[in-house]
Amino acid sequence: MAEEADTNIEIWKIKKLIKGLESARGNGTSMISLIMPPRDQVSRVTKMLGDEYGTASNIKSRVNRQSVLSAITSAQQRLKLYNKVPTNGLVLYTGTIVNDDGKEKKVTFDFEPFRPINASLYLCDNKFHTEALNELLESDDKFGFIVMDGNGTLFGTLSGNTREVLHKFTVDLPKKHGRGGQSALRFARLRMEKRHNYVRKTAELATQFYINPATSQPNVSGLILAGSADFKTELSQSELFDPRLQAKILNVVDVSYGGENGFNQAIELSAEILSNVKFIQEKKLIGKYFEEISQDTGKYVFGVEDTLKALEMGAIETLIVWENLDINRYELKNSTTGEMVVKHFGKDQESDTSNFHDSETNAELEVQEKMPLLEWFANEYKRFGCTLEFVTNKSQEGSQFCRGFGGIGGMLRYQLDMRTFDELSDTEVYEDSD
C-alpha cells in the first residue's frame, strides 16, 4: 500500500511538472526538450548537441541565434553532471521562457523518471514537448484473478493490457450421490470433506501468489473472484481465506467457463470496476477516516494547523490531502528580531496584509520562501514516517472531506487530544514569558 501511495505521489509530481512545462512559451526556437531512454549513451547526445551548436551558429536572426546557442550550451553543461544515463533514463528541459510580465527567464529541469521511460527525443521549439512523459502517468495497477469452479482453479494477474496466468490446477470432486441408504450420508460427508480441502488449497495458493513475502502485504491493487458454481462465494467468505486478501476483493463475478476462457470473461465483466479502482480506494480511505471521527476514537486530525502539529510529532500514519488544496507555506522573517516563523495561508489570508506583520510588535514579516503546501508535503512526507494520499472531490466522500474538513486531515498511530495539546502549548508559552 505504501509503495502504491509513493507511486501516486511521483505521478502527481510529474503531472504538476507537465502542467508547468506545457504553459511555458519562448521567443523563437530557444526551448530544448531532450529525453534519453535507459541504456542510451551520454557521449552520443553530447556529440549530437555539438553538431546542433554548429548548425545553430548559422541562424540569421541574431536574437534567436543567441537564445538557441544559450539553450544548447545549458543542455551540454547539465549533461556533464552525468557520467552515464540513469537506470530509468533521463529527461531534460532547458531554454529561455517568457514570463507573464513579458520578461525572459532561463529555466532548466532535469530528472530521472521514477519508472523507465521508453522514448528518445530531441526537439528545439518555442515550447516544451511533454507528450512522451504521459506514459509515466499510465497506471501500472496489477489486479489478481481467481477463477474457481468444480473442475479446478486458475490464478492470474492483469496489468494494463497484459494478462498472465500464474498457476492452474484441476480437481476431481465426487458428484452428488443418487443412491439412498446408509452410504448416502458417508458419500455426502466425503464430498463435503473434499470440497473443504479444495477451498483450503485455493486459499493457501492465493496467499502464496498475491502476498509479497518481503512486505507481508498484497502485491495486487485488487482481487476479482470468478467462477460458475458457488465456490467463489464460499472462498470469499471462508475463514481459511487470508484477511489481507479479503480486504482487496473488488468484485465476485459469475462466468460460464473455468480456466482461461473464464479468466478472459472475468476481465471483460470487471472492466468498469477496474477502471474505477482509484475511485473505490479513495471512497474506502475516506470512509475509514470518517469512521474514526464518528466513533470518536481520538485517532484523527483535520484542518491545517492541527494536522501539521500532529505531523511534527510523528503521530500521523496516513496523511490525507485534497489534490487541489490551495494553501501556500510561507517562511517569514521578523524584520526586527530576525526570528523565522512558518505560516500557512489560503488566497483570502494572503491578501490580508496584517498576516505579514507581527501581531504584538507590528514588525514586518518578510517572505523568505513561498511554496504550495501540497508540494512541501510531496517532498517532505517520508521524513515524518507517514504515507501521503492525495484525494479528489469527485466522490461523495471526497467532496464531503473537502467541504467539511478543509481538504486536509490525517489518521493517527495513537490517540491524541489536540485540545489538551493546544492548552499545553499555551501554558508553555505563558511560562516562558514569565
UniProtKB/Swiss-Prot annotation:
Q: Which SMART domains match?
A: eRF1_1
Q: Name one GO cellular component term.
A: extracellular region
What residue stretch is flagged as signal peptide?
none
Designated name of the protein: Eukaryotic peptide chain release factor subunit 1-2
On assembly, the entry states:
Heterodimer of two subunits, one of which binds GTP.
Q: Which organism is it from?
A: Arabidopsis thaliana (Mouse-ear cress)
The gene for this chain is: ERF1-2
Q: What is its main location?
A: cytoplasm
Source organism, top-level taxon: Eukaryota
- Indicate where this protein resides in the cell: Cytoplasm
Per UniProt, the keywords (alphabetical) are: Acetylation, Cytoplasm, Growth regulation, Protein biosynthesis
GO BP term (any one): translational termination
Q: What does this protein do?
A: Directs the termination of nascent peptide synthesis (translation) in response to the termination codons UAA, UAG and UGA. Modulates plant growth and development.
